[in-house]
């Protein structure tokens, strides 16, 4: 099974996904596939209030995992609003596993990357809960006012800095808890 990116008209991702599902359910050819419209939950500040909204991670793209890309392409190529499956020359461009792994791991069943709980101690970011808990990558910056963190994703052999939402928790005070927290309980990241 390999991962591919379907290029569609921006804003029509859900329609194309539904159309592909309909075509595949009617098809006699049994092809294993999975479609993900990667999204992120992001905090937006408006008039001093912070509210959470869902935005697409890669507008105009649907992520596709399949075991037979050529056959699937011939079934779906006439979908309205579908532009193409990303290619290199005449061959479909498979997304490297290391590029797609973070996105698939962080996203929930609906393809949404939610909020992470963090606290900042000196020059370290400590992730206590959420999709960033086991993120193994580069963190560019934290915006405490907007409650966002900027992380690096590689997608289609390009670097993408993506803003994700965070909940900033007050700094731990071991004296209040009455016990020490083992070092290995949290993942540490260096601020750059």
Model region roles, listed by residue range:
Residues 1-124, 138, 144-146, 150-192:
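Acidic-enriched and Gly/Ser
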Residues 118, 131-133:
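Residue-level "contact hotspot" at macromolecular interaction interfaces
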């Amino acid at each position: 099974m390999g991962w591919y990116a379907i290029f569609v008209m921006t804003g029509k991702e859900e329609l194309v996904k539904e159309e592909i599902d309909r075509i595949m359910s009617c098809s006699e050819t049994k092809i294993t596939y999975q479609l993900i419209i990667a999204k992120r939950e992001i905090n937006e500040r408006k008039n001093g209030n912070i509210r959470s909204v869902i935005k697409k991670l890669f507008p105009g793209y649907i992520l596709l995992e399949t075991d037979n890309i050529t056959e699937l392409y011939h079934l779906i190529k006439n979908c309205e609003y579908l532009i193409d499956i990303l290619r290199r020359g005449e061959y479909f461009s498979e997304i490297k596993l290391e590029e797609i792994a973070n996105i698939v791991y962080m996203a929930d069943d609906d393809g949404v990357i939610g909020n992470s709980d963090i606290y900042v101690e000196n020059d370290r970011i400590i992730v206590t809960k959420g999709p960033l808990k086991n993120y193994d990558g580069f963190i560019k910056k934290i915006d405490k006012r907007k409650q966002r963190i900027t992380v690096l994703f590689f997608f289609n052999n390009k670097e993408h800095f993506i803003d994700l939402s965070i909940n900033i928790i007050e700094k731990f005070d071991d004296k209040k808890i009455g016990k020490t927290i083992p070092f290995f309980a949290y993942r540490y990241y260096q601020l750059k």
